[in-house]
């Protein structure tokens, strides 16, 4: 759930609404994950255990905070200006792989947001080792993934 407004107030509203659905909040196979304008990690302990968070690269988390992280994600544009069609430079490739591997080293899946959003870029993201592809073209990505099988 991508919080777009003030983090703590939005999260409190979300928690209040979700508590009306205990079958969802108690479901062990559903991970409710907050991203975007989140509270600082030191405040995560104030949220109920059914709320998980989107971690960020370069932040050192306590063991308790790490337990609340569902994935690590970052803006693609912070690491590369690749447009999805030109050749990805070796320097950019190394930066991208390093950030993905850092997430994997703490047993967390990784995603980039603000990526080029079409089949050629999805192919490259998979090759780089991302675990989750961020997209606004859900139908296109679903078709792409089905055709890859």
Predicted stretch roles:
Residues 1-149:
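Catalytic cores of phosphodiester-bond hydrolases, prominently lipid phosphodiesterases
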């Amino acid at each position: 759930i991508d919080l777009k407004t003030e983090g703590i107030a939005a999260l409190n509203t979300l928690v209040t609404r979700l508590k009306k659905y205990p079958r969802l909040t108690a479901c062990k196979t559903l991970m409710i994950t907050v991203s975007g304008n989140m509270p600082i990690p030191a405040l995560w302990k104030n949220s109920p255990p059914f709320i998980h968070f989107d971690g960020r690269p370069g932040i050192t988390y306590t063991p308790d905070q790490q337990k609340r992280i569902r994935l690590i994600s970052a803006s693609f544009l912070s690491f590369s200006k690749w447009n999805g069609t030109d050749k990805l430079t070796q320097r950019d490739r190394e930066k991208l792989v390093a950030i993905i591997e850092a997430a994997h080293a703490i047993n967390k899946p990784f995603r980039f947001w603000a990526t080029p959003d079409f089949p050629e870029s999805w192919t490259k993201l998979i090759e780089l080792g991302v675990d989750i592809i961020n997209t606004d073209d859900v139908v296109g990505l679903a078709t792409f993934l089905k055709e890859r099988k």
